[in-house]
A protein has these predicted regions:
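Contiguous beta-strand segments within globular domains
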Residues: 45-55, 61-68, 209
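Aromatic (phenylalanine/tyrosine) cluster motif
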Residues: 4, 12, 23-27
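Boundary at the C-terminal end of the N-terminal hydrophobic targeting segment
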Residues: 33, 40-44
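Bacterial N-terminal signal peptides
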Residues: 20-35
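Non-catalytic cap/lid and distal C-terminal segments of serine-dependent acyl enzymes
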Residues: 73-531
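Short beta-strands and strand-coil junctions in structured, solvent-facing domains, enriched
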Residues: 58-60, 219-220
Length: 531
């Protein structure tokens, strides 16, 4: 989910998943090549706009079984590929199709039969001048369109008129560079660990990544050990987010290095995986990410960076990270000493945003026939519907389906759904009609945190006492406060009490948290010092 506002933004750093462009890519120069257009007058046949995409002469190993995009933009200020996935007024026109294999010198045609968004067919595209670019997304280990090693074309300026036969040729001559680990500093370290558990699940090497911020004076006393603060960002936030936290002047850096600040090793998890953000719980589709985290990554970090174990670990997160921090605390109640969660994703699937997943028939349409909202502004005005958002994800996902989009609805489905016979997540609802699959909805119950607490209360309550600290804005742009009220009501009524702290912020939006970094660290210190 998006992180809009926060009283401690460096602590709970999120990312707009509605606009999937990595921030640093916005400043890349747009390369515009000469336009290659073939136009023919076809009086005896329907007009057809098409794009012929040529693979590179040397096709990279593994550059098969991917998603091919053609993106059309009115603006030359940014490469069209970097706008892919946007919703609202800034969304580009795009076409997409799956490609199983490329042959050198043999183009793949993208045209009227392929998935189109936001226009549902090419005839709806307004005629005029566009900047056009092709992108081939094939990276199997990082599910986002502009992932490292994916192929793309130079930008071409083209006049487009759906009423004429126009064939535009684009060549995939460019490649996004491989991902590099940022430079380490005195306080900043990075881990890239091959996971035996995940590699076995996927049948190929899969790596766990994390950014680490060391406490002040870490090098001065080699015998001192520190508790771990495990942080999870908003949807798809990468582990490299720590570079802006400690690498540049900021309120976080000032607090972190101040005298009297409780000393922790901060571990920022990576929000990227083969199906997008893995949510760090065990899943039929993502694999055993929860087990890999608790049995491989955290023990490795504690062993190599003088962590205190066992049990001296706390969690925090915003949005997606808010849900993950709560889920890890609930699913591993003895392993962690507390979770500080801001605006978590839905914690009760009776309020999956505004969908009651267990009772309603359709995700797109309410019982009264009104389109169901997905996003609002702080004044309550609806800015996006679920139908429109899922269509945007259908563009990104394989088989024209959101389940592998690497975005919000796709990643919830990848995490919470069973695995289909084709190896893909089973859709929670039909990607075109929105009709909810009742059997799949029943499977999702195992990740419904409120329901899980209810079903396992007797065993969980003694180990969760005083460990849940949650903040939720009452004007949350994605209606996540609705589910939080259901959890709050449950925890207030349930006995014995676990003394959970849930704070609601009137008028506060998505990303709000009630504590400063300094106050949060003080509460975390008290938690790890408990016997």
């Amino acid at each position: 989910m998006t992180s809009f506002s926060s009283s401690s933004s460096m602590l709970f750093s999120g990312r707009s998943w509605r606009l999937i462009v990595p921030f640093y890519l916005l400043f890349h120069a747009v390369i515009i090549s000469s336009t290659i257009i073939v136009t023919t007058e076809a009086a005896d046949s329907p007009a057809r706009l098409s794009f012929e995409i040529f693979p590179p002469d040397q096709i990279p190993p593994g550059a098969t079984n991917g998603r091919l995009f053609v993106i059309l933009s009115r603006s030359s200020s940014i490469q069209p590929r970097l706008t892919l996935g946007r919703t609202g007024m800034q969304r580009p026109q795009a076409l997409a199709r799956d490609v199983a294999a490329f042959s050198p010198g043999q183009p793949v045609t993208v045209g009227a039969k392929d998935f189109s968004f936001p226009a549902t067919n090419l005839s709806q595209i307004p005629p005029g001048e566009y900047f056009v670019q092709a992108l081939f997304d094939y990276n199997p280990d990082l599910r986002f369109a502009n992932a490292p090693e994916n192929l793309y074309s130079k930008v071409q300026k083209a006049g487009i008129d759906p009423a004429k036969d126009i064939a535009i040729k684009l060549a995939l001559t460019e490649q996004i560079p491989p991902e590099k680990t940022p430079k380490e500093t005195q306080f900043l370290k990075f881990v890239k660990l091959e996971s035996k558990l995940l590699s076995k699940f996927y049948g190929r090497p899969i790596f766990l990544r994390a950014g680490i911020v060391l406490p002040k004076d870490f090098d001065k006393n080699q015998s001192q050990h520190y508790p771990l603060w495990v942080q999870i960002g908003g949807l798809n936030t990468r582990y490299t987010a720590v570079t802006t936290m400690i690498g540049t002047p900021s309120s976080f850096r000032e607090t972190w290095l101040a005298e009297g600040t409780p000393r922790f090793i901060l571990v920022h998890l990576d929000g990227a995986g083969p199906l997008g953000d893995p949510y760090y719980v065990d899943s039929q589709n993502n694999g055993p990410f929860g087990e890999a985290l608790t049995k491989e990554l955290i023990p490795y970090i504690e062993a190599h960076y003088r962590g205190v174990s066992p049990g001296k670990r706390v969690l925090s997160g915003v949005s997606t990270g808010g849900w993950v921090s709560l889920a890890l605390q609930v699913f591993y109640p003895d392993y962690f000493s507390g979770a500080w969660s801001s605006c978590p994703d839905p914690v009760d699937f009776r309020a999956l945003q505004l969908i009651n997943l267990y009772d309603e028939e359709n995700a797109f349409v309410e019982a009264n026939g009104r389109e169901r909202p997905s996003e609002r502004d702080l004044r309550g005005k609806v800015t996006l519907t679920i139908r429109e958002e899922v269509r945007a994800e259908n563009l990104l996902g394989r088989n024209n389906c959101y389940t592998t989009s690497g975005e919000q609805w796709g990643e919830w489905t990848a995490t919470f759904s069973p695995r289909g016979r084709d190896g893909s997540p089973i859709p929670i609802w039909d990607p075109t009609t929105g009709r909810i699959d009742r059997e799949v909805a029943n499977y999702w119950k195992r990740y419904d945190l409120r329901l899980y607490l209810e079903q396992h209360w007797a065993e969980l309550a003694p180990n969760l006492r005083g460990k849940l600290h949650i903040a939720s804005g009452e004007a949350d742009q994605f209606y996540l406060n609705e589910a939080m009220h259901l959890l709050d009501h449950f925890l207030q009524e349930k006995k014995p009490s676990i003394e959970a702290k849930i704070v609601f912020g009137p008028g506060k939006g998505h990303g709000w948290f009630d504590l400063s970094v300094a106050d949060t660290l003080k509460e975390m210190q008290a938690a790890v010092e408990k016997p």
